[in-house]
């Protein structure tokens, strides 16, 4: 039975029961809107936007509440550590500010004070010991400038930069989420929330809340670079979605200098160029099938040539920091040796691809699980993830660029990442997943609040176990 005008179906219910996609991934154009949708979208030449107090202002409030909650949890964790310190890292902290700047934040502070070493420290076995080349310079540079300009402690400046970047990130993520939801309904990426879009606006805000209270989200109020790097990454994705490829270049460069995101970002931008070029070619073949195939292929390539040059530049940004390390130390593999040395490996041991997952879990299980079972588990994990990403709900909810970024970053982790206790934090760049998770069960009143509550409990556990907990449990190093 058709829905009554007074109570239309939600956009998610409509997407799950209508519309289709022609392949395992979304096409560049959303499914053609229905006649009813076209009338609704075009009936007013000047559509009325929802007021700010219903869109980006709630996004800021959600983020501020999450930050306040995390700060209170950090204060409680500090009090517990001072009474009963479980970790050598967390003993005798003079106050909360110091507590927010432990672990990797200390390396960023060292970069600000001493810059990078000219010689790599070596262990007895020849592997490179822990050193600051493993960390990108941007966060240290910005927080250092803030500290110098205002004459404040670098630790306070680092936390302040993270808080400011986090608030900006809340607005950018909200815009990306609402734009992705609008794309499915309108056929194009539109970051406006109009009157009549209340359902999509609520889902976008809930998705932001799920992300803001996710297990590793407390890191956004510390001296770590995550808030700044995720902001720059989200802005890079926004530039790609909107086709702002010139603006993308400086933003992508800053992203690559904030965290080791240059490789997956370059892969994403390059594959997006290929996606756009193939789509242009297919559109030409559909519109004018009588034209020569090579002529259409050349026209599609020529039309996207500038985008290709931009993609190649973005790929090159991944080599800026390694090149800096090579020039300063005189050792061409300085950055690679540092990264491998963090897990007590040497360059001559070679970089493991995929296999590091099996080897690391073999260490965790102390060799009690056969390697064939762990390999089967890894293959199952990879196939399950991409099967989930290929489902109709996923393909029709995420804008293709957000879908492609998620797929690229996940692939990067499967290929290169050494799974440690830091994996929860390393998953923060896949922010589109919070939109997917929040959009399930559209009729449930309890689902999304329970998601936020589960994330809050998870963040408290993450903080107590990894930030203020013991350094080691059995063979597992507990690092945030």
Predicted regions and their residues:
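Multi-pass, polyprenyl lipid-linked donor-dependent membrane glycosyltransferases
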Residues: 161-164, 179, 206-235, 247, ...
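Membrane-lumen/periplasm interface segments of specific transmembrane helices
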Residues: 66-84, 265-387, 398, 402, ...
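Transmembrane-helix motifs of polytopic, lipid-linked glycan transferases
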Residues: 144-145, 157-185, 190, 382-390
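Membrane-interface transmembrane helices that cradle and orient dolichyl/undecaprenyl
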Residues: 193-194, 198, 236-247, 441-442
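Transmembrane-helix signature of polytopic, membrane-embedded enzymes
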Residues: 153-156, 174-213, 231, 247, ...
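Transmembrane alpha-helix segments characteristic
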Residues: 393-416
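Short hydrophobic/aromatic helix or loop-helix immediately within or flanking a transmembrane segment
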Residues: 99-121, 125-151, 350-352
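Loop-to-helix entry region of an early transmembrane alpha helix in multi-pass inner-membrane enzymes
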Residues: 127-133, 137, 141, 149-171, ...
């Amino acid at each position: 039975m058709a829905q009554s005008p007074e109570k239309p179906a939600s956009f998610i219910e409509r997407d799950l029961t209508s519309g289709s996609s022609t392949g395992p991934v979304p096409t560049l154009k959303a499914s053609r809107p229905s006649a009813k949708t076209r009338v609704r979208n075009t009936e007013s030449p000047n559509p009325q936007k929802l007021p700010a107090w219903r869109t980006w202002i709630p996004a800021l409030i959600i983020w501020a509440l999450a930050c306040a909650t995390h700060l209170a949890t950090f204060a409680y964790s500090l009090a517990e550590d001072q009474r009963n310190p479980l970790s050598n890292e967390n003993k005798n902290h003079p106050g909360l500010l110091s507590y927010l700047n432990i672990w990797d934040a200390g390396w960023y502070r060292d970069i600000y004070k001493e810059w990078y070493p000219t010689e790599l420290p070596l262990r007895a076995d020849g592997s490179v010991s822990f050193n600051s080349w493993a960390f990108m310079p941007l966060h240290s540079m910005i927080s250092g400038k803030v500290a110098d300009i205002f004459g404040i402690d670098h630790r306070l400046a680092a936390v302040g930069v993270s808080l400011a970047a986090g608030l900006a990130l809340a607005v950018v993520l909200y815009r990306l989420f609402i734009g992705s939801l609008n794309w499915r309904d309108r056929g194009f990426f539109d970051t406006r929330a109009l009157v009549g879009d209340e359902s999509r606006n609520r889902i976008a805000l809930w998705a932001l809340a799920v992300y803001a209270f996710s297990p590793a989200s407390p890191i956004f109020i510390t001296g770590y670079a995550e808030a700044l790097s995720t902001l720059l990454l989200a802005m890079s994705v926004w530039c790609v979605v909107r086709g702002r490829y010139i603006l993308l270049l400086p933003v992508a460069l800053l992203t690559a200098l904030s965290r080791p995101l240059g490789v997956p970002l370059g892969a994403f931008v390059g594959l997006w160029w290929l996606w756009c070029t193939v789509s242009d070619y297919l559109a030409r073949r559909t519109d004018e099938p009588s034209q020569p195939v090579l002529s259409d292929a050349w026209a599609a390539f020529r039309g996207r040539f500038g985008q290709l040059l931009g993609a190649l530049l973005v790929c090159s940004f991944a080599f800026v920091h390694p090149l800096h390390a090579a020039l300063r130390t005189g050792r061409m593999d300085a950055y690679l040796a540092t990264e491998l040395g963090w897990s007590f490996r040497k360059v001559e041991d070679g970089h493991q691809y995929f296999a590091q997952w099996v080897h690391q879990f073999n260490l965790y299980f102390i060799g009690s699980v056969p390697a064939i079972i762990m390999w089967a588990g890894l293959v199952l994990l990879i196939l399950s993830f991409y099967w989930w990403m290929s489902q109709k709900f996923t393909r029709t909810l995420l804008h293709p660029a957000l879908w492609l970024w998620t797929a690229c970053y996940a692939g990067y982790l499967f290929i290169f990442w050494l799974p440690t206790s830091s994996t929860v934090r390393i998953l923060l760049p896949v922010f589109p997943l919070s939109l997917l998770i929040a959009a399930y069960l559209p009729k449930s009143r309890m689902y999304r609040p329970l998601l936020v509550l589960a994330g809050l409990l998870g963040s408290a556990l993450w903080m107590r176990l990894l930030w203020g907990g013991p350094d080691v449990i059995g063979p597992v190093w507990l690092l945030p």
